[in-house]
Every structure is written in C-alpha cells, then in structure tokens.
Amino acid sequence: MPAGDQLVAVVNGQDIPLQMDVKTTYADGSVNNAILTVALPAIAANGAVNIMLATNSAPAAATPAVNAESILQQQSYDLSVNVNIHNADGTTTDYNVNAAQVVEQALQNGTAQSWLSGPLATEVLVTTNITSTLQATFDVRTMANGQVYTDVIFGYDNAYTVNNSNLTYDLDIQNNGQTVYSQTDMTQYQHTSWQTAVWSSGAAPTLNTVYDVPYMVSTGDIPAIDTSQQVSAADVEANYAALNASNTCPMGTALLTTYMGGTGQTD
C-alpha cells in the first residue's frame, strides 16, 4: 500500500472501523506487512458478513489509542501463574507469578513492549523470570469493547547457560480465581517455548475467517493455486480424527514423525 494512503474496511457499502499497525515497510515507505484490527458489525448465529478492504487517500481522523491500564482496571484483570518445579533430588519448589501485577507495573514504568496501539486494540508484551532459566511472557491485548486476551508464553530457551537439563513441572493458570489451564508432570525440553491463550470472558470467540483465494491469487498476493483441485472430505476427517487421538499437549509431537533419519515425504 502506498505511503500516506489509509486502509478502510467496507461492509455492505459502509465503512467500518479499522486499525492498521504497520510492521514493515519498503524503501519508498509503502506498507509491506501490517496487522489489521476490524470492529465487526453484529453477526447472527451461523451467519456471515463479507468484508472488502480498500485504500483511501484521505487522512485518517486522529483518535486516541485504547488505554490498556484503564481497561485492565475496569475488568478487574486477575491472572496468575503457579509453577511447581520438580527438582533432581526429588523435592519440589513452588513459584507464583501475579501476571496482573507484573503487567500493571510494566505499563506504569514504561517497560512494556508495544505491539498494537490504536482505537480498537492495544497490545503489549511483558516478560518476567519464573526461575533463572524459565521465563513467562504475557502478551496482553486489550480491546475497545472491554475484552482482554492474554497469550501466556513459557520460554525455556536460554542458550547461554551451561548444565541445563529438561525441566519437569506442574502448572496451574488461574483467571479471576478459577483454573483455566493446568498440566501435571509436564516436561519442557531445553531451548523450547510453548503458549496458551486466556480470554477474560472465559471462552475464545468462535469466528472463522474465510479468505477470497481467487481474488488473492489475482492480486499476486499468494502463488497461483489451482482451486479446481479438491481435497477429499474423507481424508480431512481421517486426519482430524488422527490429530485428536495424538498427543497435542505442550511438547507433544502430534502427527509429526520424530525419526530424523528419513528422506521425508509429502502427503
């Protein structure tokens, strides 16, 4: 998108609120990659809405960004992480991280890393140490409608320390005093990270985005996919059933082949 232009979202001929956070640009200032946030109109159960994106050279009206600290206070944001580390000598060590407190302090002292900032959504990342090698990152998105989404990321990926081994721990993540995610005797391997999402409403939205593939091909945005080639519904159902029966927990291998000596194949 050319530098200086604005992006608008159109539904039934009417512009709807859109926020664009530009992440990378080309040398001439035009947009290469951006994250779009759209305020959708009400959609009936099992309904659908078509959204068209278009450019507009008119300057966007200045609107204040969502105040993350204010939204978190309004929603009484209360997220905590409890980790029980299994030590090599058979003992255990408990650690507790009050995510709400960690995020609030980072917002107040300016150390929170900004990812999105606009009138529809503000997103920040805050990282804290659980142990000397295990870190928790809270990727907190606050939205204008009051919703709060937190991506909790556990990183055991410090490559500059010695004598590390796999880490085994029990985990309990609580939102407003209620357990929303837990694991027992989970082993996290060296140099890995994993994540889980928590919504303030308790349940993730059930929206499903369907892209206009032929149009995207025509613009050169994606390679020329032959959409006449169909995938067997039976194959999709079989793979879905196999995935559900596999280990999809953190550090699980799901349907991946763990043997590295093969020549590789594509189904």
Regions inferred by a protein language model and the residue ranges of each:
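Catalytic cores of extracellular degradative/oxidative enzymes
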Residues: 118-119, 127-267
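Alpha-mannosidase-like glycoside hydrolase catalytic domains involved in N-glycan trimming
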Residues: 1-96, 102-127, 141
